[in-house]
Amino acid sequence: MYAIIETGGKQLKVEEGQEIYIEKLDANEGDTVTFDKVLFVGGETVKIGNPTVEGATVTARVQKHGRQKKIIVFKYKAKKNYRRKQGHRQPYTKVVIEKINA
């Protein structure tokens, strides 16, 4: 059984036992989080949401928080001695999908 959930402005296909990296959640490590925005549930029977599947939830456990690899944003204008360098590391949360309730 699998489901498509929406979290952090992104849609993800998840299965039970899968580890996924999502946008940072306001939860502590070891906490259980529930995703209510389930757009699709697949398996033996298929349920398609309009826009979400009523009564369907996905339960996950927060494993850790972290920050992704640094990206560099560099702007310059040729021949004008104008340079701006900025770095960014996006925070993320690693969760393990425990149960899909449909």
Curated annotation (Swiss-Prot):
Keyword field: Ribonucleoprotein, Ribosomal protein, RNA-binding, rRNA-binding
Alphabetical list of InterPro entries matching this protein: bL21-like, bL21-like_sf, Ribosomal_bL21, Ribosomal_bL21_CS
Record-level Gene Ontology MF annotations: rRNA binding; structural constituent of ribosome
Domain of life: Bacteria
GO cellular component, one term: cytoplasm
GO terms under biological process: translation
Subunit text: Part of the 50S ribosomal subunit. Contacts protein L20.
Function (record text): This protein binds to 23S rRNA in the presence of protein L20.
Family the entry assigns: Belongs to the bacterial ribosomal protein bL21 family.
Protein name: Large ribosomal subunit protein bL21
Species, as recorded: Geobacillus kaustophilus (strain HTA426)
Gene: rplU
